[in-house]
Amino acid sequence: MSTQHDEHDAAGATGVADQVVAAAERARAASHGLALATRAEKDAALQAMAEALLTREPEVLAANGEDVARAEANGTPPNIVDRLRLTQERVAAMAQGLRDVAALPDPVGEVLRGSTLANGLEMRQVRVPFGVVGMIYEARPNVTADAAGICLKSGNAVLLRGSSSARSSNAAIVAALRDAIAGTGLDPDVVQQVPGDSHDSVKALMRARGHVDVLIPRGGAGLIRSVVEESTVPVIETGVGNCHVYVDRAADLDKALAIVLNAKTHRTSVCNAAESLLVHADLADTFVPRVVAALQEAGVTVHGDERFQAEDGVLPATDEDYGQEYLSLDISAAVVPDLDGAIAHIRRWSSQHTEAIVTEDLAAARRFTAAVDSAAVLVNASTRFTDGGEFGFGAEIGISTQKLHARGPMGLTEMTSTKYVVTGDGHVR
């Protein structure tokens, strides 16, 4: 029996893999036409996609209701259900996001540099699409529309593999987007949902080297680690956000309190929320009681070192806490001896996403920004500002915490590569 079952599973996995490859081949064929599309053609498609989301909002929300009900019945944590849930406002924001992408400059064809060489050859380096992008992401249906829009504008076809917990929402969104794209004359296969809900489809996408040009995972640490370790397709690693706020001895404490509260509580389920608080030892008696009281009043559970534990209600912090991306109303906290102590703590525990310093000392700020090796380092500002929209990119497909190709919020230009176009007049070597 087990042999028959194993053979059935293997056959099923092979079938899913074949379906994923077939989808990738359709995406490749569609990408050739998209790479040649004008900005006007792409922008028309984006506007149509936005309108389709609004027109078909009732069916999108109905599909999302199925996903939310299933998640709640399965005991999914509230912060994950919040990511999964769509509302009229969130659908409207998705549509507006597509319109915002349409308003952005087209990166394709941009000349980065050019010159006439000594031998008379004219050389230009220009932006070009990757080709076919694979997206693997967790329970955020808005990513479906965001990724489709950014990939289309940057000339890339996209294969979308969202969480099975959002399968109904994603299917409704993709159907609306594909119909809109087809209505403008572009090939709808530039946006596809990866066939299948099982892990076999994820594995097939990760093994589709030669069919998929780049894979971008968005989600928790487990998902990202799995994709990075198992994929044969090149991966752009988007970040787990164990983000720190360090309150320096020269901080304005009113600013510091506002920044800590915003960074932790504004929206807990996102990767740029603060997860760890560091306070200079000189402020232990003045700022620690104040910030603990404010955090607790906001519903935050503080996991602290010995000094923080002197305050009522603070739980002991472990190594696991200091390395944790909570994505909830929890924060780890420690008193550090000085600026170098803060830097050392961040170097040990950071996921290299975003760190912030609060200080009025320019020298301390400069040392912190130079010494801390993260994708974004902020001075006197909340970690919540690490975002493509806030940075003026108009949109982002994720926040990269790796160093190759792209780092930080990934906008349209980060979704392109380059090629060299060289023009001669019968030149031979």
Curated annotation (Swiss-Prot):
It comes from the Bacteria. PANTHER family: DELTA-1-PYRROLINE-5-CARBOXYLATE SYNTHASE (PTHR11063:SF8), GLUTAMATE SEMIALDEHYDE DEHYDROGENASE (PTHR11063). This is Gamma-glutamyl phosphate reductase. It is found in: Cytoplasm. Its main location: cytoplasm. One of its GO terms (cellular component) is cytoplasm. It comes from Nocardioides sp. (strain ATCC BAA-499 / JS614). One of its GO terms (biological process) is L-proline biosynthetic process. Catalyzes the NADPH-dependent reduction of L-glutamate 5-phosphate into L-glutamate 5-semialdehyde and phosphate. The product spontaneously undergoes cyclization to form 1-pyrroline-5-carboxylate. Pfam families: Aldedh. Belongs to the gamma-glutamyl phosphate reductase family. It is an enzyme of class 1 (oxidoreductase). Transmembrane segments: none annotated. CDD domains: ALDH_F18-19_ProA-GPR. HAMAP family: ProA. It catalyses: L-glutamate 5-semialdehyde + phosphate + NADP(+) = L-glutamyl 5-phosphate + NADPH + H(+). Coiled coil: none annotated. NCBIfam families: PRK00197.1, proA. Pathway: Amino-acid biosynthesis; L-proline biosynthesis; L-glutamate 5-semialdehyde from L-glutamate: step 2/2. Keywords: Amino-acid biosynthesis, Cytoplasm, NADP, Oxidoreductase, Proline biosynthesis. SUPFAM superfamilies: ALDH-like. InterPro entries: Ald_DH/histidinol_DH, Ald_DH_C, Ald_DH_N, Aldehyde_DH_dom, G-glutamylP_reductase_CS, Glu-5-SA_DH, GPR_dom.
